[in-house]
From Swiss-Prot:
Keywords: DNA-binding, Metal-binding, Nucleus, Receptor, Transcription, Transcription regulation, Zinc, Zinc-finger. Its main location: nucleus. This is Ecdysone-inducible protein E75. Residues 562-571 have a biased composition (Basic and acidic residues). GO terms for cellular component: nucleus. Residues 414-434, 589-604, 667-676 have a biased composition (Low complexity). Belongs to the nuclear hormone receptor family. NR1 subfamily. It comes from Choristoneura fumiferana (Spruce budworm moth). Orphan receptor possibly involved in the regulation of genes in the ecdysteroid cascade.
Length: 690
């Protein structure tokens, strides 16, 4: 295998961010030089995004051609990919890198790909030297991996190393637990009730830090045991973290399963004390978890596992290939198979009469994972409730102190506090009366939580020094329920009267205060919205008369001045109904509208809309062509008048009769109604015709 890295490849600056998937090679550190993040497969540089064969240094990281082109298209076209539907935690590998483009782009950005990291030119010699040194170190790591793989193939050696690792890191072996159990039965020392986790015997007042420190050395033992398993150091940092995070509680529970004493129905705690099953608190409703844990512990203890079997079973629980997020699944599967074969060998030696014991032991893994999930959920609930309880206690202390301080000022104003008075909204308390202050403060917190009845909100009588103290609280304001028959719009005719229903003979401060507030409340008309007022107001104009005025003929505007004058002289005179135009004067005139009932008379619409009337009375605006035709007609009319005057003068002078003018020789006027020339006709001036 050769290194795919040409001298003319484009290289850029190296980011100092830690690798996402963890390299198998420790980077070469030099002063004032960026850290080199490269993954090798022998002598081949791998892509930082998908693990494929890298083609060079692109956009700041070593990547393949596929990831380089994908990142270039994404940033140049500004593509917005659809969000991931798997919690944005998809594993980007060579075989599935095209399934989730959202997580692939996220991985590209996480490993350090950037448009600004592009640099053109050859690879510097110093960079080449660093890469070659990393390759050599990768070769040595490869040799170490081959040695570890050979160790995995050696079953007796693998078995011995796993058992030795378990005995060195576990404090609760079979012999030690037997001694602790005998000592606890002879001299039982019962611890105080603890939380849902049955292996913590600390008192209730311990902090979370003490709770964590009690299990710190036990958890550290499980982590050290995992590091001593052959082949575990060959995994990447991410794979190590994934295996430990998923199987830590499972392995810890398998180690501590011998601490449960089923006959005595108790637990041997880490400090050697006994704790009864019934004394375990179920603060997080963990009764089901406790019962399931005891049942599973009884099932496991009935198998009487040896230390070698427990060590190998813990290794199998930790090295499981079906954990989500693993990258080197092949190596994990190989380790799991080797450990399982070693456990089969040990069981065959110790339990030759039980051939199905291995299957029976492996069937407990689903129940173990279920208990781990329940424990994690209840632990989260416990932490949330514990923090909430501390917060409530702090708030309770803060509420009591200001309550007593405010009582000093109130007592100065009223020496007797609030004895049968409604002067203040809440009952004050004096510093010298702690019982009264504490009682009222407790009532105040109950009222704020809304857990008291309607009767408890009434008068509270407290006997103190022979006086009846009656704290009066301001009544809460309730929203008025809407009636099913209420449309939401009032008619304005309702009488705002308070209906007094049948009530009790005695009155409470709350009822008197509500009556006082209702008396001071303004009328509903003042609070009525604008929409209700508009709907309740009478119409500004009669709809029928408005339609009549709108549809009157245009002819009425010819006599607008006369109508206006009559309207000014008689503003309340009824307007006659317009008569329709008839083609024959002798035809009977029928009214355009049927006879209406007499209604209030108003001024004509033309007097109120003067602008509209003037615009309608104005003559129509003529186009330039129409104006030109009008001028020509007027010129001909002037010529005819002038010629008639001349002929009349000549006739008077000669004493002759008027001559009929023959228009055959005279110029013919233009016929403006037709485009073709009109035939010759006799022309008579308008004045002669008249």
């Amino acid at each position: 295998m050769t290194l795919v890295m040409s001298p003319d490849s484009s290289y850029g600056r190296y980011d100092a961010q830690p690798p996402v998937d963890g390299g198998m090679v420790n980077p070469v550190h030099r002063e004032r030089e960026p850290e080199l993040h490269i993954e090798f497969d022998g002598t081949t540089v791998l892509c930082r995004v998908c693990g494929d064969k890298a083609s060079g240094f692109h956009y700041g990281v070593h990547s393949c051609e596929g990831c380089k082109g994908f990142f270039r298209r994404s940033i140049q076209q500004k593509i917005q990919y659809r969000p991931c539907t798997k919690n944005q935690q998809c594993s980007i590998l060579r075989i599935n890198r095209n399934r989730c483009q959202y997580c692939r782009l996220k991985k590209c950005i996480a490993v350090g790909m950037s448009r600004d990291a592009v640099r053109f030119g050859r690879v510097p010699k110093r960079e080449k030297a660093r890469i070659l040194a990393a390759m050599q170190q990768s070769s040595s790591s490869r040799a170490h991996e081959q040695a570890a793989a050979a160790e995995l193939d050696d079953a007796p050696r693998l078995l011995a190393r796993v058992v030795r690792a378990h005995l060195d890191t576990c404090e609760f072996t079979r012999d030690r637990v037997a001694a602790m159990r005998a000592r606890a039965r002879d001299c039982p020392t019962y611890s105080q009730p603890t939380l849902a986790c049955p292996l913590n015997p600390a008192p209730e007042l311990q902090s979370e830090k003490e709770f964590s420190q009690r299990f710190a050395h036990v958890i550290r033992g499980v982590i050290d045991f995992a590091g001593l398993i052959p082949g575990f150091q060959l995994l990447t940092q991410d794979d190590k973290f994934t295996l430990l995070k998923s199987g830590l509680f499972d392995a810890l529970f398998v180690r501590l399963i011998c601490m449960f004493d089923a006959p005595l129905n108790s637990i041997i705690c880490l400090n050697g004390q006994l704790m009864k099953r019934d004394s375990i608190q179920s603060g997080a409703n963990a009764r089901f978890l406790v019962d399931s844990t005891f049942k599973f512990a009884e099932r496991m203890n009935s198998m009487n596992l040896t230390d070698a079997e427990i060590g190998l079973f813990c290794a199998i629980v930790l090295i499981t290939p079906d954990r989500p997020g693993l990258r080197n699944i092949e190596l994990v599967e190989r380790m799991h198979a080797r450990l399982k074969s070693c456990l089969q060998t040990v069981i065959a030696q110790n339990r030759a009469d039980r051939p199905g014991f291995l299957r029976e032991l492996m069937d407990t893994l689903p129940d173990l994972r279920t208990l781990s999930t329940l424990h994690t959920e209840k632990l989260v609930v416990f932490r949330t409730e514990h923090k909430e309880l501390l917060r409530q206690q702090m708030w309770g202390d803060e509420e009591v102190c200001p309550w007593a301080d405010s009582g000093v000022d109130d007592s100065a104003r009223s020496p007797l506090g609030s004895v049968s008075s409604s002067e203040s909204g809440e009952a004050p308390s004096d510093c010298g009366t702690p019982l009264l202050a504490a009682t009222l403060a407790g009532r105040r917190r109950l009222d704020s939580r809304g857990s008291v009845d309607e009767e408890a909100l009434g008068v509270a009588h407290l006997a103190h020094n022979g006086l009846t103290v009656t704290p009066v609280r301001p009544p809460p304001r309730y929203r008025k329920l809407d009636s099913p028959t209420d449309s939401g719009i009032e008619s304005g005719n309702e009488k705002h009267e308070r209906i007094v229903g049948p009530g009790s003979g005695c009155s409470s401060p709350r009822s008197s205060l509500e009556e006082h507030m209702e008396d001071r409340r303004p009328l509903a008309a003042d609070d009525m919205p604008v929409l209700k007022r508009v709907l309740q107001a009478p119409p500004l104009y009669d709809a029928s008369s408005l339609m009549d005025e709108a549809y009157k003929p245009h002819k009425k505007f010819r006599a607008m001045r006369r109508d206006t004058g009559e309207a000014e002289a008689r503003p309340m005179r009824p307007t006659p109904s317009p008569q329709p135009m008839h083609p024959h004067p002798g035809s009977p005139a029928h009214p355009a509208h049927p006879a209406h009932s007499p209604r209030p008379l108003r001024a004509p619409l033309s007097s109120t809309h003067s602008v509209l009337a003037k615009s309608l009375m104005e003559g129509p605006r003529m186009t330039p062509e129409q104006l030109k035709r009008t001028d020509i007609i007027q010129q001909y009319m002037r010529r005819g008048e002038a010629g008639e005057e001349c002929r009349a003068g000549l006739l008077l002078y000669r004493g002759a009769s008027p001559l009929q003018v023959d228009v055959a020789d005279a110029p013919q006027p233009l016929n403006l109604s037709k485009k073709s020339p009109s035939p010759p006709r006799s022309f008579m001036p308008p004045m002669l015709e008249a």
